[in-house]
Regions:
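Pyridoxal 5′-phosphate
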Residues: 1-214
Length: 214
């Protein structure tokens, strides 16, 4: 059995035919399929562990809390964060960005300030900042792309000013797969006193992430 077949066999949803052909799924950028190890872990949780976390001292409550905090520690190690307190669980990237925009954005962006985004952004990393800019009477600035769909450090720098408060950028484009130079952009943003917000939904599953280094 080749490595491709071995990996495919870990995804039971692919063991079916569509239009008389073996199913090939190419929409993982929107919603990824789950391997057996994940399906089995979720199944085991609901069969043997499920309870409220951080709410009770009974056996199931303790098991659920341990599993919950264990998952937080696994994520911390996976993205190489320094402290487990840095890891906050949400329903997904869209919800997470909306929370940041409606809390940090609404608190720290003032009239006349600037928010910088790129033309590569998923709507989840665009619409929340449009809303913040509109409500706070701030300016939303867009970074142009090269002819082949890339974001350059120079193009980002051209949009920064002393009024820049937030730079929001995808690490990897969900449409083109373009890898953006977020480390260099973060350095420029911080030099201006701005906060860098990275949408890493497409990069974290496919490349090594070190949020401390970024």
């Amino acid at each position: 059995m080749g490595i491709d077949a071995s990996i495919r066999n870990q995804f039971p949803i692919l063991d079916q035919q569509v239009n008389d052909r073996k199913l090939v799924y190419l929409d993982s950028a929107a919603s990824s399929q789950k391997p057996l190890v994940v399906i089995n872990a979720i199944d085991d949780y609901y069969k043997t562990i499920h309870s409220n976390v951080h709410r009770g001292v009974h056996t199931l409550g303790t098991r659920a809390t341990d599993a919950y905090e264990g998952a937080r520690e696994n994520v911390r190690r996976f993205i190489q964060a320094q402290h487990h307190e840095e890891i906050i669980f949400t329903r997904g990237t869209t919800t997470a960005i909306n929370i940041v925009a409606s809390s940090y954005g609404m608190e720290h962006v003032e009239e006349g300030d600037e928010i910088v985004v790129t033309y590569l952004e998923h709507h989840a990393n665009l619409i929340p900042w449009q809303q913040v800019a509109k409500r706070k009477k701030a300016k939303l600035k867009y970074v142009d792309l090269t002819a082949d769909g890339r974001v350059t450090v120079e193009a980002v720098e051209a949009q920064l000013s002393d009024r820049t408060k937030i730079v929001a950028m995808a690490h990897v484009s969900n449409v083109l797969g373009t890898i953006n130079p977020i480390k260099e952009v973060a350095r420029l943003a911080h030099a201006r006193g701005a906060v860098m917000i990275v949408d890493a939904a497409q990069s974290a599953p496919h490349q090594r992430i070190n949020v401390t280094d970024l």
